[in-house]
Amino acid sequence: MNGLQSDAISHYLTWAKLHSNARFNLAASGVLDYPLAELPVHIEDLEIGGTGPYGYQPLMERLATKAGVPKECVVYTLGTSMANFVALTALVHRGDEVLIERPTYDPLLTILDHIGAKVRRFERLAEKGFKLGLGEFERKLTAQTRLVILCNLHNPSSTFIDESTMRQAGDMASKVGARVLVDEVYLETLFEQPWRSAFHLGANFVVTSSLTKAYGLSGIRCGWILAEPELVRRMWQVVDFTYGSPVHPAELLAVIAFDHLDRVRDRARALLETNRVLVNEFLVRHPDLDCDPSRFGTTVFPRLRVGHTAEFVRILREQFETSVVPGEFFEQPRHFRIGFCGATETVRGGLERLSAALEAFQPPSR
């Protein structure tokens, strides 16, 4: 097992759990919870025990079928957060060089700090729509790079990396002997656009994902890792340190959810399509924000043209009962993240209050 640093904490997750709640929550990035009553679940379908030593086989079969891979390439985890922790713990040793995008999801950096990795960064620039720039990416790779980390869709901007670009990034990483870990949890929201997991693009790809963000099934905690069988065996050994056995009722619920995923997907698609119109109309009305229209995902990441967001976010929550994620958690203090994946009335009301707060906001003079 790799050595771990005991003082690494995720300031973002602490904030999200303790300070993000508000009457109008635009901080969340996962689709509104799917009602359990709308799944054909009966109490007699559930059991306390019955899981296998390394995955409940009916669930493992569904995960493998969904991903189009053999079961030997799948690790079951309790959500994407655990998937990322397990994957990174298995892939990275203390002192290994890891190349990761900026901005990125804060807990990924925290895990790397926890492990003691040597972290290098490459920029995904706001003025270029946070697209993955292959030139910048290739320049930052070195002969010592052991792992590259990408989010697709990008968190926080929801920018999509197309298959050609992802394949080229994988080829560049392969030339220096590096693997590529891709967090694909938000890619599940590309309901209308065909896509393949990056796992199918090259032997050096490892992928994490879950049902938590795109489907409103966060409470089931169904996540997974896709990796080559040799890596999968190592990752299961990391899982052994996290629990003796998973929550079997959650595994059974996940099987039921997979068997009715079309129904769950249709509800999520309709919600996001409606809310995306609202957020894009909001962005058009606000030239004081710099942000491309939303095309994918559950979030946008606008930049305040004047002022920093820390004070604005505080005023928004305290005076307008609305929460967004401060850009400081993504190392972008002029930005903030808006989630538009809640109930439509909540999103509409939150955007109205966000408009009012922007009109009232007077950034402090220098």
Give each language-model segment a name.
Residues 126-193:
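Active-site phosphate-binding strand-loop segment of PLP-dependent enzymes
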Residues 2-82, 86, 361-366:
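N-terminal small-domain helix-loop-helix segment of the aminotransferase-like
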Residues 115, 175-176, 286, 320, ...:
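Helix C-cap/helix->beta junction micro-motif
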Residues 6, 90-150:
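PLP-dependent aminotransferase-like
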Residues 255, 271-280, 290-303:
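Conserved glycine-rich beta-strand-loop-beta hairpin in the small C-terminal domain of fold type I
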Residues 315-324, 330-366:
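PLP-dependent enzyme catalytic core of the Aspartate aminotransferase-like
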Residues 201-273, 280, 352, 363:
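Conserved core segment of the aminotransferase class I/II
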Residues 96, 117, 175-179, 203:
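A short helix->loop->beta-strand "cap" motif at the edges of active sites that frequently abuts
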